[in-house]
Amino acid sequence: LARRWKMKKILKGGVIGTLMSNYGLENFLRTEKIKFFRTKVGDRYVKEKMKKFNFNLGGEQSGHIILGKFATTGDGLMVALEVLFSLRKGKKASQLLNVFKPLPQILENIMVKNKNVINKTKCKKAIRKANKLMNGYGRLLIRKSGTEPKIRIMGESYDKNLIFKCIKIIKRSIK
C-alpha cells in the first residue's frame, strides 16, 4: 500500500510501525525512499505518532493497519478494499503482497508471576550477554506484555540459530 500510495501521491510523509515491525519492511521502505518510524506496540501509539508526524499510513505486525486517509482506527474491511482495488489494476496477489523478504523473527512469550523480573540484575546481565552475542547481526526486543502476565522476547536475524541461542540465554534468566 505504501508504495502504491506514494506513486499516486496519496501517502503523507511515510509509514509508522511498531517496535515489533520486521526489519525487512523497514529495509524495503528505505529502498522505496519512504520514511519509516517505530513506536511502542499498540494501535494507540501508532495513531499518536501518525498524528504527530501528519502521516496517513501506519500499523502493527499483527495486521492492524490504520489508513489515515479514510479512518482514525484500524479497519480490516477498508484495508481489504484497498488491496482488492490494487488487484483490480491487473497485479497478481503474489506480486502485490510479496514485495519484501522478512527477516526470520521468533517471538517467545514467557508466563511470569511478576513482570518486573526483567528489571532484576540476573536478567539484565543475560539481556546484555544476548545483545553482545547478536553484535549487529540482528536485534532483540524484551518487553512486558501490556495485557497478560508475560514477558515477550522477540529475536530477529538472518541467522535463526543465533536468535534461538539469544532467546535461550534470556529465558533461563527469567525462569
Which functions belong to the PLM regions below?
Residues 1-7:
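Cysteine protease catalytic core and zymogen-processing segment of caspase-like enzymes
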